[in-house]
């Protein structure tokens, strides 16, 4: 029987309902900003970062978590003796700052939240040093200061051998016209930036697949990839801050940005407006994702609804700017390509990939 994210215990319909309830309640608190000389700009609720508007700048705030990728690191360490906590620390920073930049904010400060079931977790010096070094490296890649954090011991809440990694990030948009407002128009080009692998989403399903493989995380990926399954899963996430900074430096207008995380390619239609996002140049799925689909097995539609499938970030730009945006990405070390276009089709909202026979309608994404 084919595996799915839902069968692994992750149900977005339940999670998204709670998120919508939080957004509705949160709106009732926005009046508090006036006492600080700030205001809530229109359309910020439901975006990847929350904006606060000042006289000549915006502040942006994000709280995010790693998820369960560190459990893969623990399992692989038990098999190989190598710690991957430098990698998962970079992942943790990436989850925050990649959301932050979608509104045009550049990261200023990042804080770590590291909750453990037992303070003895920190007695493993090699693991702890790797975690610290990786978090600092992630902040350097993001151009942000590591401002602090919290290390609670939560016995009875967090299982004894585990750690829960998360944090928050503060960003700033200045001048204000660098804000990315979602001004997407029919005919806009969609530019994809490559991911490093699964990055931080879909790991619950990936762990379930490992549990049913005879060699587990030591299974070769194949398809031309020399790594084991565990090694491939633990490749650190790409941090896309330098791309946005370079586009701003070159004066390139970005109409919208999407961090392709939970909900897979459905995230490409996060905007409320009814557009059809047509992906006309999908690349072949990288080796790791082909392995996942075969080993699960995971059906094609489920794979693209869950994983990034090799695409970590998407930029929506005027078609005449697409070559310049791709050049800016490549100049800062990213693999980028023209992947598709935005079109109108009445009130329809969807992501369509004709070459793969895939269409995700708007009702398959119930949260912004």
Model segments located where?
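Glycine-/charge-enriched secondary-structure boundary and capping motifs
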Residues: 2-9, 14, 24, 124-142, ...
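Glycine-rich phosphate/pyrophosphate-binding loop regions near the starts of catalytic domains
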Residues: 31-196, 360
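Short helix/loop capping segments that flank catalytic or ligand/cofactor-binding pockets
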Residues: 69-71, 177-178, 200-203, 266-268, ...
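Acidic-glycine-rich active-site phosphate/pyrophosphate-binding loop
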Residues: 59, 65-69, 219, 282-293
């Amino acid at each position: 029987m084919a595996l799915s994210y839902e069968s692994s215990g992750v149900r977005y319909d339940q999670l998204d309902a709670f998120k919508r309830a939080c957004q509705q309640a949160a709106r009732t608190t926005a009046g508090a900003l006036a006492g600080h000389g700030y205001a809530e700009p229109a359309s910020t609720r439901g975006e990847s970062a929350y904006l606060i508007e000042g006289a000549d700048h915006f502040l942006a705030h994000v709280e995010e978590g790693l998820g369960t990728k560190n459990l893969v690191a623990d399992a692989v360490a038990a098999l190989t003796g190598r710690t991957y906590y430098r990698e998962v620390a970079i992942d943790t920073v990436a989850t925050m700052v990649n959301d932050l930049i979608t509104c045009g904010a550049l990261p200023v400060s990042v804080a770590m939240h590291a909750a453990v079931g037992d303070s003895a977790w920190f007695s493993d010096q090699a693991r702890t040093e790797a975690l610290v070094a990786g978090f600092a490296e992630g902040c350097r890649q993001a151009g942000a200061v590591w401002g602090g954090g919290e290390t609670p011991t939560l016995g009875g809440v967090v299982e004894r051998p585990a750690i829960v990694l998360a944090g928050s990030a503060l960003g700033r948009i200045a001048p204000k016209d660098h804000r990315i407002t979602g001004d997407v128009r029919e005919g806009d080009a969609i530019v994809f930036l490559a991911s490093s692998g699964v990055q931080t989403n879909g790991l619950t399903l990936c762990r379930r697949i490992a549990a049913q493989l005879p060699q587990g995380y030591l299974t070769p990926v194949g398809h031309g990839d020399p790594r084991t399954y565990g090694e491939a899963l633990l490749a650190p996430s790409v941090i896309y801050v330098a791309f946005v900074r370079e586009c701003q430096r070159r004066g390139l207008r970005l109409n919208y940005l999407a961090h392709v995380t939970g909900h897979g390619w459905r995230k490409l239609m996060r905007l409320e407006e009814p557009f059809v996002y047509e992906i006309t140049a999908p690349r072949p799925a990288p080796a790791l994702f082909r392995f996942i689909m075969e080993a699960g097995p995971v059906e094609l539609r489920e794979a693209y609804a869950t994983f990034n499938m090799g695409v970590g970030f998407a930029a929506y730009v005027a078609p005449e700017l697409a070559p310049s945006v791709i050049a800016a990405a490549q100049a800062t070390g990213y693999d980028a390509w023209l992947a598709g276009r935005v079109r109108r089709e009445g009130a329809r909202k969807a992501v369509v990939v004709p070459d793969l026979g895939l269409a995700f309608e708007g009702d398959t994404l119930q949260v912004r």
